[in-house]
Amino acid sequence: MTKKMNVESFNLDHTIVDAPFVRLAGIKEGINGDVIHKYDIRFKQPNKEHMEMPALHSLEHLMAENIRNHTDKVVDISPMGCQTGFYVSLINHDNYEDVLAILEKTLNDVLAADEVPACNEVQCGWAASHSLEGAKAIAQEMLSKKDSWHVIYQPGKEPQA
């Protein structure tokens, strides 16, 4: 990685991060003063493990629906194509500790769910690809490691400035 790229995550050295973690990935300010904070919610260690698509898909539905019960600041929650995490974008909300609390509440909602919201052909583009049990397992694993969500890099491997 010598040339700086346009995509923030392409400039992140994925070999030194230590998932799971919650990382501020970017800040954008609009012309009217609104500020978007984008967070990298990394569930799985890059290039070592990933979420299976049916479980990831259900987790996406569950988190997208339930996170909005805990804050009205969510702009979007999107899965990463590499299947290791999600991006969560919030408008005019910059409190990292509150983001962690919102994520914890949302993942607890996943554990309490008895169905995947919008899991049908009318509301979902691939309704056959879901796993509530898989989503719950991912949420449980993430919650079990919540004390380390603030640790982004492997010990002694922080990026050089």
From Swiss-Prot:
Which source organism does the UniProt entry give? Answer: Macrococcus caseolyticus (strain JCSC5402) (Macrococcoides caseolyticum)
Sites binding Fe cation sit at: H57, H61, C124
> Of which family is this protein a member?
Belongs to the LuxS family.
Regions annotated as coiled coil: none
From which domain of life does this come?
A: Bacteria
**Record Gene3D superfamilies:** S-ribosylhomocysteinase (LuxS)
- Listed GO MF terms: iron ion binding; S-ribosylhomocysteine lyase activity
What is its biological role? Involved in the synthesis of autoinducer 2 (AI-2) which is secreted by bacteria and is used to communicate both the cell density and the metabolic potential of the environment. The regulation of gene expression in response to changes in cell density is called quorum sensing. Catalyzes the transformation of S-ribosylhomocysteine (RHC) to homocysteine (HC) and 4,5-dihydroxy-2,3-pentadione (DPD).
Catalytic activity annotation = S-(5-deoxy-D-ribos-5-yl)-L-homocysteine = (S)-4,5-dihydroxypentane-2,3-dione + L-homocysteine
Alphabetical UniProt keywords: Autoinducer synthesis, Iron, Lyase, Metal-binding, Quorum sensing
Claim: Zinc is one of the keywords in the record: no
EC category: lyase
Q: What protein am I looking at? A: S-ribosylhomocysteine lyase
Cite the record's note on assembly.
Homodimer.
| A Pfam family of this chain | LuxS
